[in-house]
């Protein structure tokens, strides 16, 4: 809700956050989406976790594709695999089946994840070569 968007805004503006875990409620706050886009702040999206914690009513209604289409940088994540019993392949399957994600979409999210990682540029280049 509005509090969540405000927290994302404050994390970016006051704490200089470069990545935000979850943060999907900014879909209803255009200025915060603009801020993420402008400052290149990446949202770490966890579709199944967002559904299981009632942040979204179903995985099919998850706003990830709308966030991407708006230009908000996002990555695909599995949150806590041991708690939720899922892995990244599970998230990919859901996004492909329910949101029409293509190989190009997954590639873009993986590129974003590599770029947004906190490792140095040399290590990023090595990791990306192996993807």
What do the predicted segments below correspond to?
Residues 47-53, 75-77, 93-98:
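Short beta-alpha connecting loops at secondary-structure transitions
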Residues 1-55:
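Active-site core of metal-dependent hydrolases
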Residues 16, 43-45, 70-75, 88-93:
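Short acidic (Asp/Glu) and glycine-rich catalytic loops that position anionic groups and cofactors
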Residues 90, 100-131:
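Mid-to-C-terminal alpha-helical segments outside catalytic/metal-binding sites
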Residues 57-65:
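Charged helix-capping and loop-helix junction motifs
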Residues 1-2, 67-87:
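Short acidic/histidine-rich active-site segments
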Residues 32, 88-100:
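C-terminal helical cap(s) of enzyme catalytic domains, especially alpha/beta-barrels
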